[in-house]
Amino acid sequence: YIVEDDFDCEFRMVGKPIPSVQSMDRNHRVIYINTFSKTMVPSLRIGYMVLPEKLMERYISTMNFYSCTVSGFEQYAMAAFLEQGYFERHIRRLINDYRGQRERICRMFRKSPLSRISQIYQDDAGTHFLLHVRTDLSDVEIKWAARQRGILVNCLSEYCFADTQKYRGILVIHYSDMEDEVLQKVIGALEEIFL
């Protein structure tokens, strides 16, 4: 079986959502899991799992003892929120908010001296975008230099299985709810590293 964690799938800013692997699974070999912690509030702690029919009986017989830690009230409230269409409207509002944040942050990067040696890729991003910096530094050196300045940086090569050199110098910038003050610190640290 394949376990598909479709975390953050709701926040695609451009075009239709990318279909889940589970939605294309003709052999019923994908277990689909997701959570409402990013779309609602982390303290809600409600997740869900879609099992292939073949696994349902086995799941029920082995997990029957499990006592759910989420209150029934929260579960019923979430179910009503979904059934009455409020969740979809909530997601649309979040997407508009995140789109505004992304545009503001990209504007700040474009006004920075860093823009002379970098390019932003944001077409299909959710709550992140890619910043490709033309540099001779390795991704390990970039991460180390950023950490020395109190910044945690993810590089695209960390998410790749092979040919990581092809993705050298591409930073994954996560931006949800990032204050301007924090962003200025991040941009300043990146300018120190690359300029």
Residue ranges and their predicted role:
Residues 54-74:
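Active-site C-terminal subdomain of aminotransferase-like
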